[in-house]
Protein backbone atom coordinates (compact mmCIF):
# COMPACT_ATOMS: atom_id res chain seq x y z
CA UNK A 1 0.00 0.00 0.00
CA UNK A 2 1.26 3.43 -0.91
CA UNK A 3 -0.16 4.95 2.27
CA UNK A 4 1.94 2.54 4.36
CA UNK A 5 4.95 4.41 2.99
CA UNK A 6 3.78 7.95 3.75
CA UNK A 7 6.19 8.36 6.67
CA UNK A 8 8.62 5.45 6.42
CA UNK A 9 9.82 3.06 3.76
CA UNK A 10 8.99 -0.62 4.20
CA UNK A 11 11.84 -3.10 4.60
CA UNK A 12 11.85 -4.13 0.93
CA UNK A 13 11.80 -0.45 -0.05
CA UNK A 14 14.87 0.11 2.12
CA UNK A 15 16.56 -2.80 0.37
CA UNK A 16 15.98 -1.08 -2.98
CA UNK A 17 17.15 2.27 -1.61
CA UNK A 18 20.31 0.73 -0.18
CA UNK A 19 21.17 -1.43 -3.20
CA UNK A 20 20.02 0.38 -6.33
CA UNK A 21 22.88 1.28 -8.67
CA UNK A 22 23.34 4.15 -11.08
CA UNK A 23 23.08 1.69 -14.00
CA UNK A 24 19.73 0.26 -12.84
CA UNK A 25 16.25 1.09 -14.08
CA UNK A 26 13.54 1.30 -11.43
CA UNK A 27 9.94 0.47 -12.40
CA UNK A 28 7.32 1.65 -9.89
CA UNK A 29 3.66 0.65 -9.91
CA UNK A 30 1.84 1.59 -6.70
CA UNK A 31 -1.55 2.89 -5.63
CA UNK A 32 -3.98 0.35 -7.08
CA UNK A 33 -4.35 -1.57 -3.82
CA UNK A 34 -5.00 1.68 -1.95
CA UNK A 35 -8.16 1.89 -4.05
CA UNK A 36 -9.23 -1.71 -4.69
CA UNK A 37 -7.92 -3.83 -1.84
CA UNK A 38 -7.89 -1.77 1.37
CA UNK A 39 -9.08 1.79 0.77
CA UNK A 40 -9.36 4.33 3.56
CA UNK A 41 -12.74 5.86 4.39
CA UNK A 42 -11.68 9.04 2.57
CA UNK A 43 -10.62 7.09 -0.52
CA UNK A 44 -13.93 5.21 -0.53
CA UNK A 45 -15.85 8.49 -0.22
CA UNK A 46 -13.91 10.11 -3.07
CA UNK A 47 -14.26 7.05 -5.32
CA UNK A 48 -18.00 6.78 -4.71
CA UNK A 49 -18.36 10.52 -5.24
CA UNK A 50 -16.56 10.22 -8.58
CA UNK A 51 -18.59 7.17 -9.62
CA UNK A 52 -22.07 8.28 -8.55
CA UNK A 53 -22.18 12.06 -8.08
CA UNK A 54 -19.79 13.39 -10.72
CA UNK A 55 -20.74 14.02 -14.32
CA UNK A 56 -18.53 12.45 -16.99
CA UNK A 57 -17.68 15.84 -18.51
CA UNK A 58 -16.43 17.07 -15.10
CA UNK A 59 -13.92 14.23 -15.05
CA UNK A 60 -13.04 14.82 -18.69
CA UNK A 61 -12.42 18.56 -18.22
CA UNK A 62 -10.65 17.93 -14.89
CA UNK A 63 -13.04 19.97 -12.76
CA UNK A 64 -14.30 16.97 -10.74
CA UNK A 65 -14.23 17.69 -7.00
CA UNK A 66 -12.56 14.36 -6.17
CA UNK A 67 -9.76 14.66 -8.73
CA UNK A 68 -7.31 16.67 -6.52
CA UNK A 69 -7.43 13.88 -3.93
CA UNK A 70 -6.25 11.34 -6.50
CA UNK A 71 -3.79 13.82 -8.01
CA UNK A 72 -2.17 13.97 -4.58
CA UNK A 73 -2.18 10.17 -4.24
CA UNK A 74 -0.83 9.36 -7.71
CA UNK A 75 1.32 12.47 -8.04
CA UNK A 76 2.67 14.01 -4.84
CA UNK A 77 2.74 10.81 -2.77
CA UNK A 78 4.22 8.65 -5.54
CA UNK A 79 6.87 11.30 -6.25
CA UNK A 80 7.77 11.44 -2.54
CA UNK A 81 7.98 7.64 -2.41
CA UNK A 82 10.23 7.42 -5.48
CA UNK A 83 12.42 10.26 -4.18
CA UNK A 84 12.99 8.33 -0.98
CA UNK A 85 13.69 5.10 -2.89
CA UNK A 86 16.36 6.91 -4.91
CA UNK A 87 17.72 9.16 -2.15
CA UNK A 88 21.09 7.38 -1.87
CA UNK A 89 21.75 6.58 -5.54
CA UNK A 90 19.96 7.86 -8.62
CA UNK A 91 19.23 5.06 -11.08
CA UNK A 92 19.70 5.43 -14.81
CA UNK A 93 15.94 5.87 -15.22
CA UNK A 94 12.65 5.49 -13.37
CA UNK A 95 9.43 4.28 -14.98
CA UNK A 96 6.36 5.41 -13.01
CA UNK A 97 3.19 3.52 -13.89
CA UNK A 98 -0.45 4.51 -13.81
CA UNK A 99 -2.79 1.61 -13.06
CA UNK A 100 -4.38 -0.46 -15.82
CA UNK A 101 -8.10 -0.71 -16.51
CA UNK A 102 -9.87 -3.67 -14.90
CA UNK A 103 -11.53 -6.14 -17.26
CA UNK A 104 -14.95 -4.91 -18.33
CA UNK A 105 -17.86 -7.00 -17.08
CA UNK A 106 -19.38 -9.91 -18.97
CA UNK A 107 -21.95 -12.37 -17.70
CA UNK A 108 -20.41 -15.22 -15.75
CA UNK A 109 -17.16 -13.51 -14.79
CA UNK A 110 -15.97 -13.97 -11.25
CA UNK A 111 -13.53 -11.92 -9.24
CA UNK A 112 -12.65 -11.14 -5.66
CA UNK A 113 -13.14 -7.48 -6.71
CA UNK A 114 -16.64 -7.77 -8.23
CA UNK A 115 -18.27 -5.90 -5.33
CA UNK A 116 -15.76 -3.05 -5.54
CA UNK A 117 -16.08 -2.79 -9.32
CA UNK A 118 -19.87 -2.79 -9.09
CA UNK A 119 -19.80 -0.09 -6.39
CA UNK A 120 -17.68 2.04 -8.72
CA UNK A 121 -20.23 1.49 -11.52
CA UNK A 122 -17.54 -0.21 -13.58
CA UNK A 123 -19.93 -2.98 -14.60
CA UNK A 124 -22.50 -0.55 -16.02
CA UNK A 125 -20.40 2.50 -16.96
CA UNK A 126 -16.71 1.53 -17.35
CA UNK A 127 -15.94 4.62 -19.41
CA UNK A 128 -16.31 6.83 -16.36
CA UNK A 129 -13.66 5.11 -14.23
CA UNK A 130 -11.48 4.73 -17.31
CA UNK A 131 -11.66 8.49 -17.93
CA UNK A 132 -10.80 9.14 -14.27
CA UNK A 133 -7.72 6.90 -14.57
CA UNK A 134 -6.70 8.67 -17.79
CA UNK A 135 -7.03 12.07 -16.12
CA UNK A 136 -5.06 10.95 -13.05
CA UNK A 137 -2.30 9.87 -15.42
CA UNK A 138 -2.31 13.27 -17.14
CA UNK A 139 -2.47 15.46 -14.01
CA UNK A 140 -0.35 13.29 -11.71
CA UNK A 141 1.82 10.51 -13.16
CA UNK A 142 3.04 12.49 -16.18
CA UNK A 143 4.12 15.36 -13.90
CA UNK A 144 6.39 13.34 -11.61
CA UNK A 145 10.01 14.51 -11.64
CA UNK A 146 12.97 13.16 -9.68
CA UNK A 147 16.06 15.32 -9.61
CA UNK A 148 19.14 13.56 -10.99
CA UNK A 149 17.41 10.91 -13.11
CA UNK A 150 15.08 10.55 -16.07
CA UNK A 151 11.45 9.72 -15.28
CA UNK A 152 9.28 7.99 -17.86
CA UNK A 153 5.51 7.82 -17.26
CA UNK A 154 3.79 4.59 -18.29
CA UNK A 155 0.04 4.29 -18.81
CA UNK A 156 -0.54 0.59 -18.10
CA UNK A 157 -4.13 1.06 -19.28
CA UNK A 158 -2.85 1.22 -22.84
CA UNK A 159 -1.69 -2.42 -23.04
CA UNK A 160 -4.33 -3.58 -20.51
CA UNK A 161 -7.38 -1.66 -21.71
CA UNK A 162 -10.08 -3.79 -20.07
CA UNK A 163 -11.29 -5.35 -23.32
CA UNK A 164 -9.45 -8.70 -23.64
CA UNK A 165 -10.26 -11.33 -21.02
CA UNK A 166 -7.10 -13.26 -21.94
CA UNK A 167 -5.09 -10.41 -20.35
CA UNK A 168 -6.65 -10.86 -16.89
CA UNK A 169 -7.21 -13.19 -13.99
CA UNK A 170 -10.13 -12.29 -11.70
CA UNK A 171 -10.76 -9.13 -13.76
CA UNK A 172 -8.15 -7.13 -11.85
CA UNK A 173 -4.91 -9.13 -12.01
CA UNK A 174 -2.75 -9.44 -15.13
CA UNK A 175 -2.51 -12.93 -16.60
CA UNK A 176 0.73 -14.21 -18.14
CA UNK A 177 -0.40 -12.61 -21.42
CA UNK A 178 -1.23 -9.35 -19.64
CA UNK A 179 2.18 -9.43 -17.99
CA UNK A 180 3.82 -9.99 -21.37
CA UNK A 181 2.00 -6.94 -22.75
CA UNK A 182 3.13 -4.80 -19.81
CA UNK A 183 6.73 -5.99 -20.24
CA UNK A 184 6.57 -5.15 -23.95
CA UNK A 185 5.43 -1.64 -23.01
CA UNK A 186 8.38 -1.23 -20.63
CA UNK A 187 10.78 -2.31 -23.38
CA UNK A 188 9.16 0.17 -25.76
CA UNK A 189 9.46 3.03 -23.25
CA UNK A 190 13.08 2.24 -22.46
CA UNK A 191 14.21 1.75 -26.05
CA UNK A 192 17.29 3.86 -26.56
CA UNK A 193 18.02 4.00 -22.82
CA UNK A 194 19.31 0.44 -22.44
What are these regions (language model features)?
Residues 1, 149-167:
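Acidic carboxylate-rich catalytic motifs and surrounding loops in phosphoryl-/glycosyl-chemistry enzymes
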Residues 1-73:
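Conserved SGNH/GDSL esterase-like catalytic core that processes O-acyl groups on lipids
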Residues 3, 34-38, 102-108, 161-164:
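Short catalytic/ligand-binding loop motif for oxyanion handling, primarily in non-cytosolic enzymes
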Residues 13, 71, 75, 79, ...:
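Short, amphipathic alpha-helical "lid/cap" segments that border enzyme active or binding sites
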Residues 73-95, 132-155:
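A structural motif corresponding to the C-terminal end of an alpha-helix
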Residues 97-101, 155-158:
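Short, well-ordered beta-to-alpha junction loops that form the rim of enzyme active sites
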Residues 104-154, 179-183:
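Substrate-gating cap/lid alpha-helix
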Residues 166-194:
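Histidine-centered active-site loop/cap adjacent to the catalytic His
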